[in-house]
Swiss-Prot record:
Species lineage: Eukaryota, Fungi, Fungi incertae sedis, Microsporidia, Unikaryonidae
Protein's name in the database: CTP synthase
Source organism, top-level taxon: Eukaryota
Catalytic residues, chain numbering: 385, 509, 511
The organism of origin for this protein: Encephalitozoon cuniculi (strain GB-M1)
Record-linked Pfam families: CTP_synth_N, GATase
Length: 535
């Protein structure tokens, strides 16, 4: 078993997740079975309650774990399905260890960082290494031969020191010949063009304090490091000059694997780990090139949300739209519409609209107005999760005349709460989050046709509220069709409007199941309908 361990020592948020995903994709293209593991030093139990401005979107795995957004990159780049076992948030690790102590599992011993926390980190990494990896498209799961481990944050932080120490012991346990350490760090470039490497040098020095040394240094920045910069990093950081690589800002993150491949990262890893290529399959890399390519025609899709786009709040949705655009052969231009400060002109310049998921009352009036505009003007629309619920509310208000139609999330009581807390199969209200992959039974209609005519699909959910079926039956007389239900048919999951080019709402999150080689059919349907409208 071989391990590629990715970390950084200057600043966070420079692309460790993209580099980790790219390394996985490149090794997979050479015939290896790859899995991923991430250590998040923060003390939160998971990413589920973290604000998008703090940490980007919450990515939902099929088993229901709410993870860091990097897990979306791991799954998309490598076409695999991961589980909560592939993740260590610091808070959950401490919680699990204390829980075991309370249950008597440590037989009265004094709990310490070393050995108890450090050994548990090592145990979890090795457990993932022994767990078969499931491909997204199905097929037989295979035991990995390479694990790409990402350490979040930066080396030298208080929170990271425990985990860096664990990685040092991990190298001792599995052997240096089985570990390759990769640094992803930022080069500061002055206006004069001079590249400053002191931050990278200090990051590598901090790493050596734990008895570790980087094998590869990847320099992020506006430009690649010049020869003098490479030489300085090599000398100061004790890394071979040919293993000092650059990764400048690219037009698309999906071009990163090919850029790193061109500059020799696979050959470097092969030398360090003693790996041999087991074959060559470039199909996924070719698809990455297609996703990153510019097309002649374009389509403008509006995303109506309350979170600012620069905080990665809708990363999976943006990726899903790009995949569908590449599949059709059009550029998808995202039009960001703030649901709290908008004008009708914002809606009018869009060929199609997405109302994404979210929580809380802030900005919902703008979303409802966008839904009304799209429905009345024939603009293709896809409502996701909260967007689905608000679409039902808008139709109940403006088609059925239920002016007080609302959601229990925003108004605890009322006559026409058409969206309410989830209830179980016995009708008992259950306020817990419904999260993870669930089956959806499809009825005849456009949505089923887009899915290829299958009877049942599995989609990822994350919600506490559902549409009250008995409150919305009147919509059936106005061309609204409910065409997707939870297993057993008791909960509405999907609607479509017959007299509209594309007006679809889904309770689940299709963006979490979109892949470069398998764009999601509903999102492709939206992009296709929007492109037709733009002609």
């Amino acid at each position: 078993m071989k391990y590629v361990i990715v970390s950084g020592g200057v600043i966070s948020g420079v692309g460790k997740g993209i580099v980790s995903s790219s390394i996985g994709a490149l090794l997979k293209s050479r015939g290896h079975v790859v899995t991923h593991f991430k250590i998040d030093p923060y003390l939160n139990y998971n990413a589920g309650r973290m604000h998008p401005y703090e940490h980007g979107e919450v990515y939902v795995l099929d088993d229901g774990h709410e993870c860091d957004m990097d897990f979306g990159n791991y799954e998309r780049f490598n076409g695999i399905k991961l589980s909560g076992a592939n993740s260590i948030p610091g808070g959950r690790l401490l919680h699990d260890i204390v829980k075991c102590e309370r249950e008597g599992s440590f037989l009265g011993k004094t709990l310490q960082i070393n050995p108890h926390i450090i050994d548990e980190v090592i145990r979890r990494i090795r457990a993932v290494a022994d767990t078969p990896v499931e491909s997204f498209g199905g097929g037989q799961a295979a035991v990995p031969d390479v694990v790409v481990v990402e350490l979040g944050g930066t080396v030298g932080e208080y929170e990271s020191s425990i985990y860096t120490e664990a990685l040092a012991k991990f190298q001792y346990v599995v052997g240096k010949a089985n570990c390759a350490f990769v640094s992803v760090d930022y080069i500061v470039e002055l206006e004069t063009g001079e590249q400053k490497t002191k931050g990278i040098q200090m990051g590598c020095r901090n790493f050596r304090r734990f008895g570790l040394n980087y094998d590869i240094v990847i320099c992020r920045g506006r430009r690649e490091p010049n020869m003098e910069t490479r030489r300085k990093i090599s000398t100061s950081c004790w890394v071979k000059e040919e293993n000092v690589l650059g990764l400048p800002n690219l037009e698309s993150v999906y071009l990163a694997p090919m850029f790193l491949e061109k500059h020799g990262i696979v050959e470097a890893l092969n030398r360090i780990l003693g790996l041999d290529d087991k074959g060559m399959d470039r199909r996924m890399l070719d698809i990455f090139s297609m996703v990153g390519r510019r097309h002649r025609d374009g389509v403008r899709i509006g995303i109506v949300g309350k979170y600012a786009p620069e905080f990665d709040s809708y990363t999976s949705l943006v990726n899903a739209l790009k995949f569908s655009g590449a599949h059709i052969g059009v550029n998808v231009e995202i039009v960001w519409i703030n649901s709290e400060s908008y004008s009708v002109c914002d809606f009018e310049r869009c060929d199609g609209v997405v109302i994404p998921g979210g929580f809380g009352a802030r900005g919902i009036s703008g979303k409802i107005e966008a839904i009304r505009h799209a429905r009345e003007n024939g603009v293709p629309l896809l409502g996701i999760c909260l967007g689905y619920q608000l679409s039902v509310i808008e139709m109940c208000r403006n088609i059925l005349g239920m002016s007080d139609a609302f959601s229990e999330e925003f108004q605890p009581s009322g006559k026409n709460l058409v969206v309410r807390f989830i209830s179980d199969e016995n009708g008992v209200v259950d306020k817990r989050l419904r999260v993870g992959g669930y089956g959806v039974e499809l009825r005849d209609g456009l949505v089923k046709k887009l899915y290829g005519g299958v009877e049942t699909v599995r989609e990822r959910h994350r919600h506490r509220f559902e549409v009250a079926q008995e409150k919305v039956r009147g919509l059936l007389q106005h061309g609204v069709r409910f065409v997707g239900f939870s297993s057993g048919g008791k909960k509405i999951n999907v609607f479509e409007v017959e007299s509209h080019p594309f007006f679809v709402g889904v309770q689940f999150h299709p963006e979490f199941n979109a892949r470069p080689d398998r764009p999601h059919p509903l999102i492709t349907g939206l992009v296709s309908a929007s492109y037709e409208r733009s002609k």
